[in-house]
């Protein structure tokens, strides 16, 4: 229906925007665009369609299985996976490539899960964990040890909380802003070190 057409138009509109942003950023040595076109077009589309409700659904009782699944889904949501087993497969694939990266994904998802529990926000679907997981994964690629990914996770959680307070859908905005903050403060990328 109409929503499928809107998704198609938004996807097509994001391609030239992404190409333009990436070209400008590379030309000026600036920050990477990451998910900026998705966030801009997604927010515009969501805010134009209807008022967005970011109210919290019922929060399940935190038993071991539900917590484990939410922890995994915080990683799975990075690529829109909604099943814990699929998320575990993604985590295993990342671990095969880099155990360090997999551990940072787990740490980011755990921080989001913990923050959601503290804030009384929904947590079982993994939505609270994917932004800090993404920020940690992006920032661990630069030198500087554990501080930069930790800063990214904390900033992503704080920005996610601000989005909730403002009634905005977070999408990947917390990841984007937190990662930009971390990159603005970073040591040089390993490939740029002489």
Predicted regions and their residues:
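C-terminal transmembrane helix-loop-helix hairpin of multi-pass membrane proteins
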Residues: 1-47, 61-86, 100-194
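Membrane-helix interface motif
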Residues: 50-58
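Transmembrane alpha-helical segments in integral membrane proteins
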Residues: 88-100
